[in-house]
Amino acid sequence: MRCISCREEYLPRNAGTCKECYVEAGETEEELKREIDDLKAKVAFLRLSSSLDHGTSSTSRSFTDVVLIASEDNAGSPPIPAHKSVLVSRSPVFKAMLENEMEESLSGTIKISDVSYDALRTFVYYLYTAEACLDEQMACDLLVMSEKYQVKHLKSYCERFLVTKLSPDNSLMTYAFAHQHNAKHVLDAALSQIVENMDKLTKREEYMELVEKDPRLIVEIYEAYLSKQVNTAAGGTSTSKTS
């Protein structure tokens, strides 16, 4: 028998590879593990400590020089401390806001509209750590904020999460949401779900709401559906001619 790696002859009792290739593969695996561990250590080293971290000392908090306030919460939620340098390095919008003599830069207070305290806190924490605990609502809230403040890494992170939560039941509303916020990855995945389940979804209440509120989306959905039908028919015709 021949080795699947180097194509050299090997004894039949060996499982698919010769001894040399097996040893080499094991060494490569160990090397990759070491590289992964090294990368993890570097990420941990480069991860910025946030004033929102549990156990952060009051000393480190004293070095913050800006606070963010969620204006949606009228119950007097506490301001969220941060560092201008971090906000500026993570967001072009914050950079323009804080490097010029705008009100936020002078006052040291940034009011964020249409966002809950929890969403804003998670957003700021992500800017420091590239970590966020998501559910579907939080992912939507953070995607909106990441688009507004041009935090591309966070937007991609939220999009990937939302795609994993897609189903025929939520595909229509997710499609409308993704369209509104330019979330192309989610948009394409939701459209695929809709097209695959078109016969069921056209009878749903969400579909009728979409017809009334945003008929252009319905046009796009039907264009995608008809395109799929044409491609399917063309594929069937080609197969029958070949046979």
Swiss-Prot record:
Cross-referenced Pfam families: BTB
InterPro entries (UniProt xref): BTB/POZ_dom (IPR000210), SKP1/BTB/POZ_sf (IPR011333)
GO biological process: one example: regulation of proteolysis
Gene Ontology cellular component annotations, sorted alphabetically: cytoplasm
Residues annotated as domain BTB: 64-136
Keywords: Coiled coil, Ubl conjugation pathway
Domain of life: Eukaryota
PANTHER family xref list: SPECKLE-TYPE POZ PROTEIN
Domain-level remarks: The BTB/POZ domain mediates the interaction with some component of ubiquitin ligase complexes.
Name by which UniProt lists this protein: BTB/POZ domain-containing protein At4g08455
Source organism of the structure: Arabidopsis thaliana
